[in-house]
A protein has these predicted regions:
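Conserved catalytic cores and adjacent C-terminal regulatory segments
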Residues: 1-308
């Protein structure tokens, strides 16, 4: 038997791209995403997408469709990444660029007080514990973690350094200071594969991994010589998040062959900035998503026919 794993990358407001692609898959299969996949993994904004698709309603069915998550980005993207000039200026030296309160408001609005146990499928969210120097995974199938509130797990996986403050949680009597899982697994497909092999040891595995778009942006040698400690931060984060995508693609491509399906492309018109929430950029991101669907038409159609 084949088990299907969904993996969704991080990328801030660019999370609208995988949400649109998943809405297309729900439309073609006439099935909710949580019914198609046996394990669903997400990092950062990808965590919001997958958790939204796994959240149960009162009848035990999916609370949100992928289109509902598209609407979330359109309605609340600019609210989450709302800042003021003074805060941005201070953030270069001390503190995060954006207030966590806006993000937490949106997470509470969509996920309430529900815990990881109140989800469908097997859900995996990534984060990194900067206090204990180790990755930390939120897994709804683990009894020692499934009573953590979804909004707290999502606050942790979206705590991108310099953008939002870390999330403090006490879990099983251990103090944890958690930040965005993108610092080690911006594409969480390998994390999903490892968990899938443990959960389904006797089954074949197929992974659908959806990206949020990449950029050609580089750091030229002449520019890098002039960067100081402070101005290195954002470019370094871009390199760190981007390099992990390439590594996972190579590794899973070698191990799984055509059982690893990757939908990703270079952004052609939209901004790569994770906090660019202008109306124009959101419109451009939606257009990028449609181009990704068009460019991967055969892959998507074949996958939908198999799982429908």
């Amino acid at each position: 038997m084949t088990k299907y794993i969904l993996s969704v990358d991080g990328g801030g407001i660019r999370g609208i791209i995988p949400a649109i692609i998943l809405a297309e898959i729900e439309k073609r299969t006439r099935k909710p995403i949580a019914q198609i996949f046996d394990l669903i993994a997400g990092t950062s904004t990808g965590g919001i997408v997958v958790a939204g698709l796994c959240k149960k309603d009162e009848q035990g069915k999916p609370k949100y469709s992928a289109q509902d998550l598209v609407d979330l980005y359109q309605k609340y993207g600019s609210y989450i990444f709302r800042s003021f000039f003074l805060r941005k200026a201070i953030a270069w030296f001390n503190g995060a660029e954006y207030s966590h309160k806006n993000l937490e408001y949106v997470l509470t609005r969509y996920f309430g007080e529900d815990t990881l146990s109140n989800t469908l499928s097997n859900l995996l969210l990534t984060s990194y514990d900067i206090d204990n120097h180790c990755p930390f995974f939120f897994k709804n199938w683990r009894e020692d973690r499934n009573l953590i509130k979804l909004k707290d797990a999502l606050r942790a996986t979206t705590a991108a350094p310099t953008y939002f403050t870390p999330k403090y949680l006490k879990i099983n009597q251990i103090n944890r200071v958690l930040v965005d899982g993108g610092i080690f697994a911006n594409n969480p497909a390998a994390c999903g594969y490892a968990s899938g092999k443990r959960l389904f040891p006797n089954d074949d595995i197929t992974i659908l991994s959806i990206g949020t778009g990449t950029s050609e942006r580089t750091i030229k040698y002449s520019s890098s010589k002039r960067l100081g400690k402070i101005t290195w931060v954002k470019p370094l984060l871009d390199v760190m998040f981007g390099s992990s995508l390439d590594a996972v693609d190579y590794q899973l491509g070698e191990v799984m062959g055509d059982k690893y399906i990757r939908i990703q492309s270079q952004l052609k018109i939209a901004s790569v900035e994770i906090d660019n929430t202008t109306a124009k950029n959101i419109k451009d991101l939606k257009q990028e998503a449609q181009m990704m669907i068009s460019d991967n038409q055969r892959l998507i159609e074949e996958f939908c026919q198999v799982v429908a």
